């Protein structure tokens, strides 16, 4: 018994020695397995294997099987002839081959970066799992290759040794100085280091012996210099819209003043740039805008008063300290989607990245630090699946973010069982989980938007105002939503001290979002003017049901104000196949499968749904329909949208004599109400000759009166207007000619060119005027020639 362990090690050592020798000589290493072709099925293969002392390891594919022989050496430099020849003589065996061990190397196998500062990048992968799980994404082979990221900031030091290898000029521009070079402006205080530091977090080169590594260290990185100068709406829009089909991700760590009293957001051009980015960027998949949530924590600011982070088009990121606490500068709001790491207290580590003047720093901090980390993780995710849309990415973030290790007192479970916080969103980004889920991700259904006006009259806010409204989330319309993504409460209100207000929104599934917390420094009496407070906390909930808006005065003062407008805007999806035709209401009788067979009065049945107006090409008609009940078949008279005759474009019935309008290739007979095809010659003759007068209907045929197209009252105003204009013109011309005849010989005439007959006479100018302007005949002729040439040009145009 004691010899068995020794025997195992001897065999293992012998096998290893065989491999080493074979590798050195370049020889084949034969294994104790065979691939065998045996028609007839697995039972025949099993029988042949047992007959010759083999074990059938299973089917490779088709009639090919994998045989193993325990008595044959596992590794050998020569083939096993005896067993091979026995199998070869078997009639059922059509082909066989002893298997050879092949050397195969994994490509892009993960190796830990060798950069000197990498061990200090605790947030990429740590032993306590308080990290972003970036090394797991690297181990899966994703490093950001093929993805382009642009940092919208104060420039990027493109010649930095840890950035130059990944620098992309196509993702860079200097909007401040209007040139392609984004190099920052150097000052004694290094004020413009922001963009260079952010760039290093995303794509610092790996294994080059400089500084640390970027999250997506094989991604391409660029920068837009747009903050080192006067920032206008045009500057922002141009930066946000730079090369949208080349740049995949835009990272921004800036916004309005974080002073606890500002309410500001993108203006017209920047808002349009956001919309164009998500609708047209990346070939229609949508640009991804990553935004830092804000630095106004000390001022009790709310990032819902920042229109950039509060936008549905941005992926808003917050931060946590090394030990999972809320940083002192962090802002809380319901628009935050997820969190990455940044700095905190003095005894906690900060972020390692590139710095100005080709240096490295270990003390990067603030919102500048955490948004670029998210941009890098998103670059890894896009490499795993380049077909992800901008909304797919937000779905992945919601589904994979981890609330563990993050400390806050406002963690809550929403209506679909996810934990969410105003400080952290759905938790820490998990790079490994995101790339794993992205690889087989199915694109979400197209976005739907449901807009509901809640208020019917202004309401006094007082100490506390509560507005309740039960909604169907646009049921029966194309915008019907069953799975929510973003929800907006667009509010217009006046209040004498805006900072005392706290606003909450409660979803039908009970999720309570803080749209606005009290801001002690906000003394403004401006209120809010159609401001869209956004929440992501009800993601994937069913928005149908009662929504509750709560507005509260948090101070003891007798403040006053009025809520004048409240519009609930829901963004989301509905399951594929859910019927959402226009005006799908008014059904009177439903089948067991919820298909409509009879509509209420004023509605017509169209494709198993009730509509108030039949679509073009259809007309309502009362027909007998057969309705199958459990034990019988009933005949029901119902209004149904029936198709027009093939010759009609629109109609009032299914017959060829029910046409109201015709296709472009046909003309309408106003008497017969039929459409007839026209040849090219007949169309030309109709254009040259006036149409014949309408033929009166035969007197002897008694038919039901029908509204004729040539008697429609809608043409009467046009006829009256035309006759009136003709009469006025006739009177004017008559009076003008009479006056000209009476005074025609007492004034001089000037001939100028016109388009029609070439000459027209302007009369009525006194001779003194000509003498004053034309001191000589030559000057008069010259002036007349110039005017004539001018009028010729104008007439030609």
Swiss-Prot record:
Start-end of Pro residues biased regions: 689-699
List of residues that carry Phosphoserine: 776, 778
Disulphide-bonded residues: 211-360, 303-333, 450-474
N-terminal signal peptide: 1-26
Stretches assigned to the Peptidase S8 domain: 121-435
Membrane topology value: Single-pass type I membrane protein
Residues marked Cleavage, second (site): 75-76
Chain positions of site Cleavage, first: 107-108
Gene3D superfamilies named among the record's database cross-references: Galactose-binding domain-like, Hormone Receptor, Insulin-like Growth Factor Receptor 1, Chain A, domain 2, Peptidase S8, pro-domain, Peptidase S8/S53 domain
Prosegment residue ranges: 27-107
BP GO terms, sorted: cytokine precursor processing; peptide hormone processing
Location of the region described as Disordered in the Swiss-Prot/TrEMBL record: 160-183, 673-702, 770-797
Enzyme active site: 153 (charge relay system), 194 (charge relay system), 368 (charge relay system)
Binding site for Ca(2+) 3: 258, 301, 331
Placement of FU repeats on the sequence: 577-620, 638-681
Residues reported in the UniProt entry to bind Ca(2+) 2: 174, 179, 181
Subcellular location: Golgi apparatus, trans-Golgi network membrane; Cell membrane; Secreted; Endosome membrane
PANTHER family, per database record: FURIN, PROPROTEIN CONVERTASE SUBTILISIN/KEXIN-RELATED
Protein known as: Furin
Naturally occurring in which organism (per UniProt): Bos taurus
């Amino acid at each position: 018994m004691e010899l068995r362990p020794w025997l195992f090690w001897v065999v293992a050592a012998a096998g290893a020695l065989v491999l080493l020798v074979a590798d050195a000589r370049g020889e084949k290493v034969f294994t104790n397995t065979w691939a065998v072709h045996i028609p007839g099925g697995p039972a025949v293969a099993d029988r042949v294997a047992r007959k010759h002392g083999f074990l059938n390891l299973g089917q490779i594919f088709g009639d090919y099987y994998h045989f193993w022989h325990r008595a044959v050496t596992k590794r050998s430099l020569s083939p096993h002839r005896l067993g091979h020849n026995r199998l070869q003589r078997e009639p059922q065996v059509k082909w066989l081959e002893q298997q050879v061990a092949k050397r195969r190397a994994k490509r892009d196998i993960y190796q830990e970066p060798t950069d000197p500062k990498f061990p200090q990048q605790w947030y990429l992968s740590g032993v306590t799992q308080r990290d972003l799980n970036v090394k797991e994404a690297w181990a899966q082979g994703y490093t950001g290759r093929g993805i382009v990221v642009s940092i919208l900031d104060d420039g990027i030091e493109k010649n930095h040794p840890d950035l130059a290898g990944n620098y992309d000029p196509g993702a860079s521009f200097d909007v401040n100085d209007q040139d392609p070079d984004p190099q920052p402006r150097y000052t004694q205080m290094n004020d413009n280091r922001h963009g260079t530091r952010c760039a290093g977090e995303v794509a610092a080169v790996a294994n080059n012996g400089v500084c640390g590594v970027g999250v997506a260290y094989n991604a391409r990185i660029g920068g837009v210099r747009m903050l080192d100068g006067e920032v206008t709406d045009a500057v922002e829009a141009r930066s946000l819209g730079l090369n949208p089909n080349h740049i995949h991700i835009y990272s921004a760590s800036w916004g309005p003043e974080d002073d606890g009293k500002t309410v500001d957001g993108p203006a017209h051009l920047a808002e349009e740039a956001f919309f164009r980015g998500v609708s047209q960027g990346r070939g229609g998949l949508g640009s991804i805008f990553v935004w830092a949530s804000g630095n106004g924590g000390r001022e009790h600011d709310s990032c819902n008063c920042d229109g950039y982070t509060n936008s549905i088009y941005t992926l808003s990121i917050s931060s946590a300290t090394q030990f999972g606490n809320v940083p002192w500068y962090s802002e809380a709001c319901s628009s935050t989607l997820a969190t990455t790491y940044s700095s905190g207290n003095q005894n906690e580590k900060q972020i390692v990245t590139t710095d100005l003047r080709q240096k490295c720093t270990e003390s990067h901090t603030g919102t500048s630090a955490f948004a670029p980390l998210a941009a890098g993780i998103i670059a890894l995710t896009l490499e795993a699946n380049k077909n992800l849309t901008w909304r797919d990415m937000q779905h992945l973030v919601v589904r994979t973010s981890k609330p563990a290790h993050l400390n806050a007192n406002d963690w809550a479970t929403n209506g679909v069982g996810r934990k969410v916080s105003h400080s952290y969103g759905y938790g820490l980004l998990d790079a490994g989980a995101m790339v794993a889920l992205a690889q087989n991700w199915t694109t979400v259904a197209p976005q739907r938007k449901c807009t509901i006006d809640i208020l019917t009259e202004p309401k006094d806010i007082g100490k506390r105002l509560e507005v309740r409204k039960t909604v169907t989330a646009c049921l029966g319309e194309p915008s019907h939503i069953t799975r929510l993504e973003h929800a907006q409460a667009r509010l217009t209100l006046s209040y004498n001290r805006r900072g005392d207000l706290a606003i909450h929104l409660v979803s039908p599934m009970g999720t309570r979002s803080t749209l606005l917390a009290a801001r002690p420094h906000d003394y403004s009496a401006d209120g809010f003017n159609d401001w869209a407070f956004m929440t992501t906390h009800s993601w994937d909930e069913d928005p149908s049901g009662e929504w509750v808006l709560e507005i509260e005065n948090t101070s003891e003062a007798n403040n006053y104000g009025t809520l004048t407008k409240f519009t609930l805007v829901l963004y989301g999806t509905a399951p594929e196949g859910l019927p959402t035709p226009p005006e799908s209401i008014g059904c009177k009788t439903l089948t067991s499968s919820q298909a409509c067979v009879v509509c209420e009065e004023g509605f017509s049945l169209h494709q198993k749904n009730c509509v108030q107006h039949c679509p073009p090409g259809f007309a309502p008609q009362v027909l007998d329909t057969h309705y199958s009940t459990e034990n019988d078949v009933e005949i029901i008279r119902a209004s149904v949208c029936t198709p027009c005759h093939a010759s009609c474009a629109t109609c009032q019935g299914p017959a060829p004599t029910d046409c109201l309008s015709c296709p472009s290739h046909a003309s309408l007979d106003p008497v017969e109400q039929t459409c007839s095809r026209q040849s090219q010659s007949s169309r030309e003759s109709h254009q040259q000759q006036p149409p014949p007068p309408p033929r009166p209907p035969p007197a002897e045929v008694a038919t039901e009166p029908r509204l004729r197209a040539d008697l429609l009252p809608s043409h009467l105003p046009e006829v009256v207007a035309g006759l009136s204009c003709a009469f006025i013109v006739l009177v004017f011309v008559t009076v003008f000619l009479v006056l000209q005849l009476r005074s025609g010989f007492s004034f001089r005439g000037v001939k100028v060119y016109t388009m029609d007959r070439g000459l027209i006479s302007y009369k009525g100018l006194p001779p003194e005027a000509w003498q004053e302007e034309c001191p000589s005949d030559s000057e008069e002729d010259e002036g007349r020639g110039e005017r004539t040439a001018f009028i010729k040009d104008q007439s030609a145009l």
